[in-house]
Swiss-Prot record:
Keywords: Coiled coil, mRNA processing, mRNA splicing, Nucleus, Spliceosome. Belongs to the SYF2 family. Residues 28-38 have a biased composition (Low complexity). It is found in: Nucleus. This is Pre-mRNA-splicing factor syf2. Residues 1-89 are annotated as: Disordered. Associated with the spliceosome. Its main location: nucleus. Residues 55-94 form a coiled coil. One of its GO terms (cellular component) is Prp19 complex.
Length: 300
């Protein structure tokens, strides 16, 4: 029995030695994956850290935007409150009353200053002129003279003066087309330069100027180039509208002179017309609404 055990033990030893040798031979290979797992763990940890940093940065940006929106909302609320208060005060105040009070205050101040100046024995107009320069005083005098001429020019004098007033009014209403002027000017310069009438010269300062060599670029009394001008469609429409407006004014004045201003004929002769006018003077304020209702058909 002991001999068999010894044999079994001795027989088992070689197998253990073989297993150990096999483990030693195969154990070198598993050690390598453990070493390669360390960089993978490092890269995964770096990725996690970068993701956390990105999330933190995005959170900070969202917080900053939220704070900016809060500040804008607060400023908008404050401005709205101020504007609402100003609007309420403006609606509660009568502008006509304010203008009347300011006008009365200016008139009272003027009279008070005039009384004090005359009481001191000084010239009021001379003292008041000290507040203005010579240029301002001359401009004011010219303005007053112009206003006085306009007042005197209102009444009809003769047809020449009437035509002059119409012409000046049309000039005031006319607005120059600077864009079209610049286009035509540029086209004229290019045409003259192509024909050799203009010479482009550079000055010492580097500025480019055009020199008229033949003296034919600018218009003179003998120039007839304006006959080739073709107005645009808008200019033609404006001219037609002005002519129609003048014709309407002329016809309206002729109707007023003839007494044909009434659109509806409600009489059969001149005597009946006078009678209807007399009735209208006394009863129009009572019958206007009734007549309008009959014309609209709402009375029935």
């Amino acid at each position: 029995m002991p001999a068999e055990c010894v044999n079994e033990v001795s027989a088992a030893k070689p197998s253990d030695d073989n297993a150990a040798s096999n483990q030693t031979q195969s154990g070198a290979a598993p050690a390598e994956p453990a070493a390669s797992e360390e960089p993978q763990q490092k890269t995964s940890s770096e990725k996690l850290e970068s993701k956390e940093d990105d999330a933190a940065a995005k959170a900070r940006q969202r917080q900053e935007r939220f704070k900016a929106l809060q500040a804008r909302a607060k400023n908008a609320a404050e401005r709205n409150l101020k504007e609402t208060a100003a609007e309420t005060q403006r609606l509660a105040t009568d502008p006509a009353l304010l203008s009347s009070l300011s006008r009365k205050h200016a008139f009272a101040s003027h009279n008070l200053l005039k009384a004090d100046t005359e009481a001191a024995g000084e010239d009021f107009e001379r003292k008041r002129a000290w507040d203005w320069t010579i240029d301002e005083s001359e401009k004011w005098d010219r303005r007053m003279e112009k206003k006085q001429r306009h007042r005197d020019d209102v009444a009809f004098q003769d047809y020449t003066q009437d035509a002059r007033k119409v012409y000046k009014r049309q000039l005031r209403q006319m607005q120059p087309d600077m864009a079209a002027y610049e286009r035509e000017k540029l086209a004229a310069i290019e045409k003259a330069a192509a024909n050799g009438d203009l010479e482009i010269v550079e000055t010492n300062d580097g500025e480019m100027i055009a020199v008229d060599k033949n003296g034919t670029f600018y218009s003179t009394a003998d120039t007839i180039g304006f006959t080739e001008n073709k107005p645009d469609r808008a200019g033609v429409d404006k001219l037609v509208a002005d002519l129609r407006k003048a014709e309407e004014v002329r016809l309206k004045k002729r109707r007023e002179r003839r007494g044909d201003e009434e659109p509806d004929v409600t009489y059969i002769n001149e005597k009946n017309k006078q009678f209807n006018q007399k009735l209208a003077r006394f009863y129009n304020k009572y019958t206007t609404e009734i007549r309008d209702s009959f014309e609209r058909g709402t009375m029935i």
